[in-house]
UniProtKB/Swiss-Prot annotation:
The keyword Ubl conjugation does not apply. Homodimer. This is Alpha-methylserine aldolase. One of its GO terms (biological process) is glycine biosynthetic process from serine. The lineage of its organism: Bacteria, Pseudomonadati, Pseudomonadota, Betaproteobacteria, Burkholderiales. Catalyzes the reversible interconversion of alpha-methyl-L-serine to L-alanine and formaldehyde. The modification N6-(pyridoxal phosphate)lysine is found at residue 255. Keywords: Lyase, Pyridoxal phosphate.
Length: 440
């Protein structure tokens, strides 16, 4: 039978051709054939990520198997609306205890008084805070893409879809963050209701206390987006945003935190969290995935026990890899500042035609990464940076001592030696043991 999906004129033609070819293949199969194909694809994904490749993309991680197993324990399909102790449905005695345990662990790990664990993504976590602090038509100030500012804070993302006007924050290019003095002048001019900090690449601590002073001076709230920094914050290897003045922290739970896909909001501001709670229920979340909540709780336990060691190892390993790549002659961004104080850093990617082109060269060697914006000259038709991170490889057992070898693989793959690098990466994966920094 022909595919039910039809061509979408608004999608790039090459992508849509690919989509429709997959749809046609699925439409031509019977039910058993589709089931077999899904199983095959799941196995193929496992091969790509877990048997033959190394993830250097800080936007992903590997889960504690005990946490991952909770996703298939029959929890997620049980509707769970309302507050523990007074749920709309009955039979939720176990699930509501899981919800409370997850929130308690989140509050412990992030040093907060309140935690909202029902959010299904980091983007929605940001939207909840936007809705709790602003009204459509209000102005916010957010980091621009040149310093890793995420789309959810801008016109094409949650902020714009909610009707907010985003003004890009002024940039401190050397520190890969905002310029606090210039921000103060801008805030007096545009009168924002919310100022955000944090993004898709974080190299050095952001000036959160100074930004809070700016926010207070114009009556704004301060949101710290820890989508990528959540693990570093949880492991106390990064300044604590709530202690430094952020009104709330939002995050994804599957990046450096190494949990299931989803979002999380923590705060010490009771009035703000009361508004966020009403947005979550009965507003936009209503019923949530209890399986994800259980997996999140199990993953947060890793941070309660091993968080400091894991975060410190990530920072040390990222710094070692950045220095090793510099020794290979590669253009590591922010050399004058020591490259990074976090779990991630970037290469200037113009030499390879841009970050996405460079990432495709790395993929030929079994090394998975992606592009990122940097406050340097643009690259026509591509992103000007290549983002690298170490959360997953550290959990797999890589240490700073392994970074010269990894840097050599990266350098060779970027110059066209992907085939030989891929063979060496596959062999190295066969010698890896169990995961580190997890509670078994």
């Amino acid at each position: 039978m022909p595919a039910a999906l039809q061509r979408r004129s608004w999608v790039p033609a090459a992508s849509e051709d690919h989509v429709l070819a997959i749809a046609a293949d699925a439409a031509a199969r019977d039910a058993l054939g589709i089931a077999a194909e899904i199983e095959r694809l799941a196995d193929d994904n496992h091969r790509i990520h877990d048997r033959e490749g190394l993830n250097l993309n800080p936007a992903t991680n590997v889960m504690n198997p005990a946490a991952e197993a909770l996703l298939s324990r029959g929890l997620g399909s049980r509707a769970s609306l309302g507050y523990p102790g007074d749920k709309y449905e009955v039979g939720l005695e176990a699930i509501e205890r899981i919800e409370v345990i997850a929130a308690e662990l989140a509050a412990e790990v992030f040093g907060s008084k309140f935690a909202e664990v029902r959010v299904s993504s980091g983007a929605l976590s940001n939207l909840y805070v936007f809705m709790a602090t602003c009204r459509p038509g209000d102005t916010i100030i957010a980091p621009p893409p040149a310093i890793g500012g995420h789309v959810t804070h801008h016109a094409a993302g949650a902020a714009g879809l909610y009707g907010l006007k985003t003004v890009p924050a002024p940039v401190d290019a050397d520190g890969y963050t905002v310029d606090a003095a210039a921000l103060a002048r801008l805030a007096r001019e545009v009168k924002p209701k919310l100022i955000t900090i944090g993004g898709s690449l974080n190299l050095f601590p952001h000036p959160v206390p100074a930004i809070r002073e700016v926010a207070d001076s114009v009556g704004a709230k301060l949101l710290f987006d820890a989508a990528h920094l959540s693990g570093m914050v949880a492991g106390k290897a990064w300044p604590q945003p709530l202690e430094e003045g952020a009104h709330a922290i939002t995050m994804s739970t599957y990046k450096s935190l190494g949990g299931p896909a989803g979002g999380l909001i923590v705060s010490n501001d009771a009035a703000l969290m009361e508004r966020i709670d009403a947005i979550a229920y009965p507003g936009l979340t209503a019923n949530s995935d209890a399986g994800r909540t259980a997996a999140l709780a199990r993953g947060l336990l890793d941070w309660k026990v091993h968080g400091r060691a894991y975060a410190a190892a990530m920072r040390e390993t990222a710094q070692a890899l950045a220095h090793a790549l510099d020794a290979e002659g590669l253009p590591v961004f922010a050399k004058a500042r020591g490259f990074t104080q976090s779990h991630q850093f970037a290469l200037e990617a113009a030499h390879w035609g841009g970050g996405q082109r460079a990432a495709k060269k790395l993929a030929e060697g079994g090394l998975l990464a992606c592009g990122i914006g940097l406050p340097i000259a643009p690259v026509e038709g591509d992103i000007n940076g290549l983002r690298l991170g170490v959360p997953e490889i550290v959990r797999l057992g890589f240490t700073p001592d392994d970074m010269p070898q990894l840097a050599s693989w990266i350098a060779r793959a970027l110059e066209g030696g992907g085939a030989s690098v891929a063979a060496e990466v596959r062999e190295r994966r066969t010698r890896l043991g169990g995961l580190r920094y997890i509670v078994r």
